[in-house]
A protein has these predicted regions:
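Extracellular beta-rich repeat passengers
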Residues: 1-204, 208-220, 224-251
Length: 251
C-alpha cells in the first residue's frame, strides 16, 4: 500500500470545511512536493504522517520545498496545526517554503518520542530554512481557551507544546516589530482576511526584485524522483530545489 508521487505546480484553495489539509500523506508514500500554492487550507498546508506503518506498509518519506502556504489554520473549528504538521515516524525534509499569514509554525507533535509510528516524527528529518511572514490583520475567530492567537505573528512566536526547539532554527520568523513582507507581484499580505477562502486568479505570487524571500539557503535536498517517476510510459521529474523561499522567484 502507499504510492509514489510528484506533487508540483498546483494551486490548492479552500481545502476542508471543518478540518483537512492541502496535502496529506500517510505510510507507504514517497513524495516530492514542490512549487505549489496552498491558499486557506482549513488546517495545514502539509500534513506529513507515517500513520499506518507496518511490516507490509513502509515509512512515509516526503520532501516539501519551495511551496507558498497562505492563511493555513484559521478556519479550523478548534486548534490543531496551522501550517505544517509532521508526525508518526514520517521522514520529512521541509525547506525553502514561504508561509504567509499562517496561524502557527511547523509542528512535530510528540517530538520527545521520535521514530515511532504512533508518536513523533523521524528525527533525521530536516524542517528548517523556511520563511514565515505576517500581515497586520486580526482573525475574527479566536479561541481564548486554547492559544488565544489572533495574529499570525502571535502564532509564530507562541510557546506551543508541539514546537520542537530543533525545528526552524535557521528560519526567518516574523515578529510583531518585524513582520517581514515578501513583496509579491500582486498579493497584499495586509489586505486579504485571515479566514478568507475565495481564491483570486489574478493574484501573482512571484517575488518582486529586492524581495527578502529571494535569498534562501538550506541543507541539500535530493528529491526522491530527481531521475524521474514513470507513469503510463511517461517519465516525470521532480523540480530541483530553488535558492529562494516559496513557489516562485522573480518573473
Amino acid at each position: 500500500m502507499g504510492g509514489s508521487a510528484i506533487i508540483s505546480g498546483n494551486v490548492f484553495a479552500a481545502n476542508g470545511y471543518s478540518g483537512a489539509e492541502a496535502v496529506n500523506i500517510k505510510a507507504g508514500v514517497k513524495a516530492d512536493i514542490a512549487g505549489n500554492i496552498m491558499f486557506s487550507p482549513n488546517t495545514n498546508g502539509l500534513k506529513l504522517s507515517s500513520s499506518g506503518q507496518s511490516e507490509t506498509r513502509g515509512q512515509a518519506i516526503a520532501n516539501a520545498y519551495n511551496n507558498t502556504i497562505i492563511n493555513a489554520g484559521w478556519r479550523r473549528d478548534g486548534e490543531k496545526g496551522g501550517c505544517v504538521y509532521v508526525e508518526k515516524n514520517c521522514l520529512a525534509n521541509v525547506v525553502n517554503n514561504l508561509m504567509v499569514n499562517c496561524k502557527f509554525r511547523a509542528m512535530t507533535p510528540n517530538y520527545k518520542n521520535p521514530n515511532a509510528s504512533d508518536a513523533g516524527f523521524d528525527d533525521k528529518s530536516v524542517i528548517d530554512y523556511n520563511m514565515y511572514v505576517s500581515g497586520t490583520q486580526k482573525s475574527p475567530i479566536v479561541y481564548p481557551e486554547e492559544s488565544n492567537v489572533a495574529y499570525s505573528y502571535e502564532g509564530y512566536n507562541y510557546k506551543h507544546k508541539s514546537y520542537n526547539p530543533a525545528v526552524d532554527t535557521h528560519s526567518v520568523i516574523a515578529a510583531k516589530d518585524n513582520l517581514v513582507n515578501p513583496g509579491f507581484v500582486n498579493f497584499d499580505i495586509n489586505a486579504v482576511g485571515l479566514t478568507e477562502y475565495g481564491y483570486n486568479p489574478t493574484w501573482d505570487f512571484h517575488l518582486s526584485s529586492g524581495s527578502p524571500a529571494l535569498s534562501a539557503t538550506s541543507a541539500k535536498v535530493i528529491p526522491c524522483f530527481e531521475n524521474g517517476l514513470e507513469v503510463n510510459g511517461k517519465l516525470y521529474k521532480s523540480p530541483s530545489l530553488k535558492p529562494y523561499f516559496g513557489a516562485f522567484g522573480t518573473k
